[in-house]
């Protein structure tokens, strides 16, 4: 009996010592063709794979083709240095060398290299054959055979632009993680066909609540190929599962910056992806032309595309020289009142400002129910104001009964901004029960603290709503007159997002 127990114990120790212990990276970064760009490594090389591992990427994506003599090799394009991969032998390919001295990797060599670590997944893309569908299925079969032969199943996830290849992978490996790339198949259909994820171009997700709906079905959502900061931040804000990028180093930096990384959750947003008039589910209009308490000169129109229109992914609020009632200018003032009202949170707006003396663009918030009485008793938060006669200067301001511009006690600060008329900047506040912080491009430049002395100091314990407008003239904006040569003049808004904790 004692001998049996000792033998069993030794078998357990032996088995445990050879058991795989994985520690897959828990982030959203998939290096597209490996991490090649920053260090000028060849794409789809062993060097780019190892760099992705070194960076700590969740995955390193690579592409599989088959030579004329049946060897599986790694390359993105159908040609490798002038040779059509599917029409030449592997030995023909060996006559060519990558810029770092590597030969074209075989799938076997790539998997063996990938298996040396247990932190970064290998994202295997099966390329559609240019010769025949049947050949593509053969590539799929042989890829699975190689993965199984090398016992690399735990490392590998699969993607393809051919839906039949995806289904073939699942027929051979029912537990494999498989995602489809092309973009035309619904999340519901992929779920029914037992795919585990969707991997579409990021533009597909910018409508119809794609990300949220797919995730509700239990599908992972990956976006390709995302190399610019605005798209990265949009996807991160919407909690996409993975992002495939040529810029993994940049994406890691953006992940650190995103509000989501600071514990914020996106509650409401308008990304302005639907061309035409602004969405009525999100926005109403303040309409009229009687000065708006500031002796402004414009008439704010109601759903007039000359003054408020979405095109090319931006909301354009345009002030123009046009007669309306007793006014000689028209513009627009959009509000989320009674469509999205909120108390506390982070509001961020990415915008490019109009240039010209006499303009007064603003991104701000007013109380929805005026809990403590009319202005200024119930408060005002000016996230961004700019007056055209003071170029490149942007203001953040708070108004209350005790602190307001009428009695010259308002609390605010101006900050110089580089190229506000030709580049987009992110204007934001973070509003808590004890303070309001103001930011431009993540630089905090003002804090207004709750003194806890009552609503005269702090009326900011009630619902507010967002306002976007471009005024003309006014006591502040028109202090040095209006230059009629500047019209039309538009504030372009890329997005409005509100986060809460």
Where are these regions (language model features)?
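Short, surface-exposed loop/turn motifs that are enriched in glycine and acidic residues
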Residues: 8, 132-133, 416-417
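Hydrophobic alpha-helical segments, especially transmembrane helices
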Residues: 3-4, 33-34, 334
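Residues in and immediately flanking transmembrane alpha helices
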Residues: 15-16, 45, 76, 398, ...
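Short, flexible active-site-adjacent loop segments at beta-strand->alpha-helix junctions, enriched
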Residues: 9-10, 35, 66, 78-79, ...
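Phosphate-group recognition and catalysis centered on beta-loop-alpha active-site segments
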Residues: 19-260
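Bacterial Sec-dependent N-terminal signal peptides
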Residues: 1-23
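GH16 jelly-roll
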Residues: 257-501
């Amino acid at each position: 009996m004692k001998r049996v127990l000792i033998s069993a114990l030794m078998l357990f120790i032996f088995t445990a010592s050879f058991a795989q212990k994985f520690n897959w990276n828990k982030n959203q970064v998939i290096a597209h063709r490996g991490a090649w760009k920053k260090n000028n490594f060849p794409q789809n090389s062993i060097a780019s794979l190892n760099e992705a591992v070194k960076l700590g990427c969740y995955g390193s994506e690579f592409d599989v083709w088959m030579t004329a003599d049946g060897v599986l090799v790694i390359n993105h394009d159908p040609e490798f240095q002038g040779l059509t991969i599917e029409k030449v032998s592997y030995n023909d390919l060996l006559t060519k060398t990558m810029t770092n001295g590597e030969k074209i990797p075989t799938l076997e060599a790539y998997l063996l290299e990938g298996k040396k670590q247990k932190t970064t997944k290998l994202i295997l893309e099966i390329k559609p054959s240019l010769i025949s569908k049947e050949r593509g299925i053969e590539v799929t079969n042989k890829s699975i055979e190689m993965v199984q032969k090398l016992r690399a199943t735990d490392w590998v996830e699969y993607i393809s632009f051919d839906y039949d290849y995806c289904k073939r992978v699942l027929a051979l490996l029912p537990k494999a993680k498989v995602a489809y790339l092309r973009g035309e198949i619904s999340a519901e259909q992929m779920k029914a066909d037992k795919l585990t994820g969707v991997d579409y171009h990021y533009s597909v997700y910018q409508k119809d609540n794609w990300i949220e709906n797919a995730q509700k079905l239990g599908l992972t959502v990956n976006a390709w190929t995302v190399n610019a900061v605005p798209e990265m931040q949009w996807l991160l804000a919407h909690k996409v599962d993975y992002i495939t990028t040529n810029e993994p180093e940049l994406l890691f930096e953006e992940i650190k910056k995103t509000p989501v990384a600071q514990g914020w959750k996106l509650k409401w947003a308008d990304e302005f992806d639907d061309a035409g008039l602004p969405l009525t589910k999100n926005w109403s209009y303040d309409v009229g032309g009687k000065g708006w308490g500031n002796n402004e000169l414009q008439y704010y129109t109601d759903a007039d595309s000359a003054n408020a229109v979405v095109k090319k992914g931006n909301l354009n609020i345009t002030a123009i020289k046009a007669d309306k009632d007793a006014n000689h200018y028209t513009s627009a003032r959009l509000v989320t009142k009674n469509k999205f009202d909120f108390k506390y949170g982070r509001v961020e707006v990415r915008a490019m400002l109009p240039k010209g003396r006499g303009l007064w663009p603003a991104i701000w918030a007013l109380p929805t129910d005026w809990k403590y009485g009319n202005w200024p008793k119930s408060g005002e938060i000016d996230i961004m104001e700019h007056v055209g006669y003071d170029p490149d200067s942007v203001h953040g301001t708070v108004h209350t009964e005790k602190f307001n511009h009428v009695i010259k006690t308002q609390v605010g600060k101006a900050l110089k901004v580089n190229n506000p008329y030709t580049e987009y900047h992110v204007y934001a506040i973070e509003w808590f029960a004890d303070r309001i912080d103001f930011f431009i491009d993540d630089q905090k430049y003002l804090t207004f603290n709750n003194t806890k002395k009552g609503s005269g100091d702090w009326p900011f314990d009630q619902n507010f709503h967002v306002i976007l407008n471009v005024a003309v003239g006014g006591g502040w904006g028109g202090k040095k007159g209006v230059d009629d040569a500047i019209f039309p003049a538009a504030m372009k808004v890329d997005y409005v997002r509100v986060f809460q904790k």
